[in-house]
């Protein structure tokens, strides 16, 4: 390759490696930084968990040097006490991942107090005057503790000898040795006894040749159900199976989506939950692009194996979490358009007719915002009798607080009483503009999205618009406080309208909508996005000559592809994107995710991959584009960004590439995250300045 195509590299103050020229007249970065730093406001809380008896609340909140656990009576959160493994009150540790004991008399949690910043271990607090007990001596990555129903054991996920957090979002290890064989890190289910006389290594339950992603105890505490796949775990979640295993026994596969017939064939499964009688396992199943971003239908399968049953087929929502109330009833947390809601699903079994029918109650609550307890996506914390659900919630306009939904009856009519439990952020106002939910028609679909207005919006002025596309694609933008690495609140505070669409392929409108972009990346979904821009321009004072596009991951792909399909965007910022699906197939650490979307491997059907590759249409690109990526990104590897930047530069299109050392797909260094947003703001301000 010619030396003329590359400039000398230089690190900026954040440690990022920048390639190519800066726009001719860069805006004042100090003023942008001042605005961005002013966005950090409000009290940040993490996981929240109600005790099984419904009387106490435990939660995580940020503290000096880490995170701490607080416990309080549900009726009066002001009377909270710190629960900690710290040896002195002034010692600050990182403590998180809560689990209540079934009798509500103890908390299990992870803490790094013994070796601050180095290793977390499992601890047990009986919430009395007795010292907190350390249960384990671990060396590796841990998460997701869960008490056995009899309270005698705590199971958790453990990567022994881990060099990095589990999952594809974390920075990948530098390649070395036999790829795919040497140094593969396997996540297993481990169990520690609560009455252990002294800390020690846990019992490894799941086999060493299976990577476990999530699990659930059987009601008799004798077995586990878990979702697992052959290593390497980062790549194989998309072909994972459902297993059961007796403690001390062998793993038994009860469901393999790749082998079943019907609508679950070849798709993904998540959130396994054992029924109270131990006969059935419920789970979420459907087309999912990322582990942890859960959406689909509610399914059940016999704990002994057999054909799975879809309990919510055709429902125009995306289930994300579930929990059994009885053997015939499930609570389901789901995304419905722009709302998060909790519903009850009834299962009616006619043994004589050999049929199963399901009915859905009206939502127990439906909120135009985010809900969750900090464990899984849209998961809730429930009392043992399921009369109380606790969660944290926020919107674009309201910071997060804890809430309780209490179920009751009056004259045989079921009622829900919702109560705000916390007031961490009372009086905190957003430093950005108001947000509204929009819907528009595209082809045969009704598409939903969110529009955030500029701070100090004046209807008499014309404004620029930035379109921010979410990742996934099987995900959804939900109204929530704050922003991501490319932040709608930040762009709003700087004077832009921001449109965040949920095009086809997103969660929130059922499996048909989620699957509507298969073999069609960049076409129908781009039409949905452009139709959303049309809607915004028709209803709000948008300057059509100042419309930009940005996004991360799948949103980064969409940014790269869109600028080769239309000249509508005046500037673009592509974060961790994909420019060439054919080369990407052989570069990434997660190639299994593409088969359900493209229908075949790139070696069997290269044309369907080329159809959606920006690089194949690069001669049509004219939009100035900033590209950013981490040098250890395994999901969307840096060569994809290099390839796109190189092609634009060769075509004399204004372009810049910034590579961040040590970062994976999800950036963790605060300085890098801030630098990405500052550079994006500068880029847009140069080519389409705010009013």
For every predicted segment, state its role.
Residues 327, 377-691:
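Serine-hydrolase catalytic core recognition
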């Amino acid at each position: 390759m010619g030396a003329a195509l590359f400039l000398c590299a230089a690190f900026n103050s954040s440690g990022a490696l920048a390639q190519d020229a800066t726009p001719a007249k860069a805006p004042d970065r100090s003023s942008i930084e001042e605005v961005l730093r002013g966005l950090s406001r409000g009290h940040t809380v993490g996981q929240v968990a109600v005790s099984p008896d419904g009387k106490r609340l435990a939660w995580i909140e940020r503290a000096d040097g880490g995170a701490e656990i607080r416990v309080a009576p549900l009726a009066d959160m002001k009377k909270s006490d710190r629960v900690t493994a710290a040896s002195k009150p002034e010692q600050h540790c990182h403590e998180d991942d809560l689990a209540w004991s079934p009798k509500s008399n103890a908390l299990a949690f992870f803490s790094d107090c013994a070796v601050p910043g180095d290793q977390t271990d499992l601890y047990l607090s009986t919430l009395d005057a007795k010292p907190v007990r350390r249960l384990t001596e671990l060396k590796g990555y841990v998460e997701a503790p869960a008490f056995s129903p009899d309270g005698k054991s705590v199971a958790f996920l453990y990567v022994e000898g881990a060099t990095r957090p589990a999952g594809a979002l974390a920075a990948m290890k530098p390649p070395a040795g036999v790829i795919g064989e040497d140094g593969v890190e396997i996540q297993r289910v481990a169990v520690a006894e609560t009455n252990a006389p002294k800390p020690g290594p846990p019992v490894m339950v799941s086999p060493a040749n299976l990577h476990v992603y999530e699990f659930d105890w059987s009601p008799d505490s004798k077995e586990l159900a878990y979702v697992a796949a052959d290593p390497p775990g980062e790549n194989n979640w998309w072909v994972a199976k459902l297993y059961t295993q007796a403690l001390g026994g062998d793993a038994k596969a009860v469901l393999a989506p790749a082998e079943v017939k019907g609508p679950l064939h070849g798709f993904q499964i998540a959130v396994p939950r054992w029924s109270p009688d131990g006969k059935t396992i419920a789970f979420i199943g459907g087309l999912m692009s990322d582990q942890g971003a859960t959406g689909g239908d509610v399914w059940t399968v016999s704990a002994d194996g057999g054909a799975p049953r879809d309990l919510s087929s055709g429902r125009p929502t995306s289930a994300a979490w579930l929990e059994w109330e009885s053997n015939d009833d499930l609570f389901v947390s789901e995304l419905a358009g722009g709302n998060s809601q909790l519903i009850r699903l009834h299962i009616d079994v006619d043994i004589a007719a050999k049929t199963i029918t399901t009915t859905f109650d009206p939502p127990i609550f439906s909120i135009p915002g985010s809900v969750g307890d900090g464990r899984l996506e849209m998961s809730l914390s429930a009392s043992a009798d399921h009369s109380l659900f606790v969660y944290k919630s926020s919107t674009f306009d309201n910071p997060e607080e804890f809430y309780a939904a209490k179920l009751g009856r009056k004259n045989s009519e079921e009622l829900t009483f919702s109560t705000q439990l916390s007031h961490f952020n009372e009086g905190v106002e957003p430093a950005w503009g108001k947000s509204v939910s929009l819907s528009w028609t595209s082809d045969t679909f009704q598409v939903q999205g969110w529009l955030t207005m500029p701070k100090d919006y004046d209807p008499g002025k014309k404004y620029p618009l930035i379109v921010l596309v979410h990742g996934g694609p099987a995900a959804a933008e939900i109204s929530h406080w704050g922003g991501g690495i490319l932040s709608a609140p930040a762009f709003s505070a700087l004077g832009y309208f921001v449109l965040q669409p949920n095009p086809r392929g997103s969660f929130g409108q059922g499996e048909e909508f989620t699957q509507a972009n298969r073999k069609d990346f960049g076409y129908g979904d781009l039409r949905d996005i452009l139709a959303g821009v049309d809607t915004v321009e028709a209803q709000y004072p948008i300057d059509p000559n100042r419309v930009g596009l940005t996004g991360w991951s799948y949103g980064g792909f969409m940014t790269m592809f869109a600028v080769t399909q239309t000249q509508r965007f005046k500037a673009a910022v592509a974060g961790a994107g994909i420019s060439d699906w054919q080369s990407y197939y052989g570069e990434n650490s997660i190639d299994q995710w593409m088969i359900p979307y493209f229908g075949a491997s790139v070696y069997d059907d290269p044309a369907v991959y080329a159809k959606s590759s920006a690089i194949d249409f690069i001669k049509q690109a004219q939009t100035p584009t900033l590209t950013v990526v981490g040098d250890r990104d395994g999901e969307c590897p840096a060569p994809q960004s290099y390839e796109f930047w190189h092609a634009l530069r060769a075509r004399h299109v204004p372009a810049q590439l910034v590579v961040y050392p040590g970062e994976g797909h999800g950036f963790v260094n605060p300085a890098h995250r801030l630098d990405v947003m500052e550079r994006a703001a500068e880029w847009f301000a140069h080519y389409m300045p705010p009013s």
